[in-house]
């Protein structure tokens, strides 16, 4: 009997201990929930802060985009040569014109690089130190090109004046001698002038090839359209002939006489 009572007492103690542990566990649960809720509040606040930072970044990007767009219009401001008919230029003038054109293209390329380098600064400065020497060299070269720009403009003005003068000279030659030079082509044989002379009998089109010593005359006659003219021309003007530079004035006089008589 005593053993049974002792066993019952122990069972009661164990039950009381179990109840105490359960009560402690129940009291702990709300605190754990409270801590979870506070963690969620911290996460929510972090989310709001991140949203504000993202909005600020968007505003920064928009400002950078505005700066870049305003600068891009500068890329369209480039030096340009005046429109010139190359056929009106002599061989030397055409070479000078092409050299000026190359120089202007180089200036425009350097200016474009300079502008793009400036526009890239608001976007990122990564690697700027590594390229600093190259940029400085290019800026120095650009400054030198700008200094030469003034003399380049003067050369362009002179070229335009020369073109006007040559046009006036061609008008004078046409009025006095009836000679027009359409163009000049340089090849391995020399200079080929495409010409035409006009007189009372009509207009004769021909090509003159000038090499180091001689002229080569090649008429360009059409049997159908130039039939009447061919009747009045001497035979030597109906075929290819070669004569020296010294004989050039004599040939010109005979050609004009044949077209007038």
From Swiss-Prot:
InterPro entries, per database record: Csm1/Pcs1 (IPR040349), Csm1/Pcs1_C (IPR020981), Csm1/Pcs1_C_sf (IPR038608)
Gene3D superfamilies for the chain: 3.90.1150.80
Residue span of region Disordered: 1-42
Biased composition, class Basic residues, residue ranges: 21-34
Record keywords: Cell cycle, Cell division, Centromere, Chromosome, Coiled coil, Meiosis, Mitosis, Nucleus
Keyword Cell division among record annotations: yes
GO function terms (MF aspect): microtubule site clamp
GO cellular component: chromosome, centromeric core domain; chromosome, centromeric region; cytosol; kinetochore; mitotic spindle; monopolin complex; nucleolus; nucleus
Pfam families: Csm1
Coiled-coil region list: 91-170
Cellular compartments annotated: Nucleus, Nucleolus; Chromosome, Centromere
UniProt keyword Cell cycle, yes or no: yes
Basic and acidic residues bias (residue ranges): 10-19
An individual GO BP term: attachment of mitotic spindle microtubules to kinetochore
PANTHER family in alphabetical order: MONOPOLIN COMPLEX SUBUNIT CSM1
Assembly and binders: Component of a monopolin-like complex composed of pcs1 and mde4. The complex associates with the kinetochore.
Function, as annotated: The monopolin-like pcs1/mde4 complex is essential for accurate chromosome segregation during mitosis and meiosis II. May clamp together microtubule binding sites on the same kinetochore, preventing merotelic attachment of microtubules. In contrast to its S.cerevisiae ortholog CSM1, is not required ofr mono-orientation during meiosis I.
Name of the protein: Monopolin complex subunit pcs1
């Amino acid at each position: 009997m005593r053993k049974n009572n002792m066993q019952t007492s122990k069972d009661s103690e164990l039950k009381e201990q179990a109840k105490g542990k359960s009560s402690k566990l129940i009291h702990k649960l709300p605190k754990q929930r409270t801590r979870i809720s506070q963690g969620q509040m911290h996460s929510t606040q972090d989310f709001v802060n991140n949203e504000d930072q993202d909005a600020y970044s968007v505003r920064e990007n928009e400002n950078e985009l505005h700066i870049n767009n305003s600068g891009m219009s500068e890329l369209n401001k480039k030096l340009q040569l005046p429109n010139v008919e190359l056929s009106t230029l002599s061989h030397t003038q055409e070479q000078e014109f092409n050299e000026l054109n190359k120089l202007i293209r180089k200036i425009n390329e350097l200016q474009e690089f300079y502008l793009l380098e400036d526009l890239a600064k608001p976007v990122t400065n990564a690697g700027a130190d590594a390229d600093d020497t190259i940029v400085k060299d290019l800026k120095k070269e650009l400054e030198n090109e700008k200094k030469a720009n003034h003399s380049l403009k003067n050369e362009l003005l002179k070229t335009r004046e020369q073109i006007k003068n040559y046009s006036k000279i061609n008008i004078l030659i046409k009025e006095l001698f009836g000679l027009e030079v359409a163009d000049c082509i340089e090849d391995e044989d020399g200079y080929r002038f495409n010409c035409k002379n006009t007189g009372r009998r009509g207009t004769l089109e021909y090509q003159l090839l000038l090499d180091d010593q001689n002229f080569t005359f090649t008429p360009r006659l059409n049997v159908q359209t130039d039939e009447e003219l061919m009747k009045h021309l001497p035979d030597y003007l109906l075929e290819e002939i070669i004569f020296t530079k010294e004989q050039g004035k004599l040939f010109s006089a005979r050609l004009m006489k044949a077209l007038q008589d």
